[in-house]
Amino acid sequence: MNVAITGSGGFIGSHLSKRLEMFGHRVTPLRRYLFAQEGVDCLAQALAGCHAVINLAGAPIDRRWTDAYKRELVESRIMTTRKLVEAVNRLHEPPGVMISASAVGYYGSSGGCHGELDAPEADSFLAELCVAWEKEAGLVNSSVRLVLTRFGVVLSPDGGALPEMMRPARFGVTATAGNPDHLFSWVALE
């Protein structure tokens, strides 16, 4: 299977690419320069012949959220997804599936356990970003199966949030970040 991936150079994307190749799939990395160009012709050419597309693009959220960085968070997700969807929709033979990342920030921190369909949408910048991001992905051609994945914090010994979280523990210090009543949604890289 030929799988196109945005964000293939990021933490999740690089591991996913290696795993897919290990299982014999061909990975087509969709690099930033394809999204920086006017129009989507080159992007559509890169997608031609792909059976699946995985959208993991987006600036890291583990930075200080200045107004300028918030704009980068939005643009790196919304504009990339918009161009990706436009390119997929232009194909005569689009991929059978598009998997597009989102985040558990959609749900906020209302406490308690919720199912994905009955959880209330949060009233926050991150929730608004997730809604807009998912809305852009939802514009993909209806012949393409759309899967939205709301990731939590990614934990792995070799990257993601875990090494940063473990740093204070090396000095014998542990603490709860934020309100201890809030849930901590996480996913293991593997």
Language model segments and positions:
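Glycine-rich NAD(P)-binding loop of the Rossmann-fold in SDR/ketoreductase-type enzymes
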Residues: 72-80, 124-128, 132, 187
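Conserved Rossmann-fold NAD(P)-dependent oxidoreductase catalytic core, especially the SDR/UDP-sugar
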Residues: 82-124
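NAD(P)H-binding glycine-rich loop region in Rossmannoid oxidoreductase-like domains
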Residues: 34-83
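Conserved beta-loop-beta element that borders a ligand/cofactor-binding pocket
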Residues: 102, 135-157
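A conserved pocket-lining segment of Rossmann-fold NAD(P)-dependent short-chain dehydrogenase/reductase
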Residues: 164-187
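Glycine-rich "substrate-gating" loop/helix at the edge of Rossmann-like oxidoreductase active sites
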Residues: 121-126, 150-159, 179-187
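N-terminal Rossmann NAD(P)H-binding glycine-rich loop of SDR-like oxidoreductase domains
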Residues: 3-22
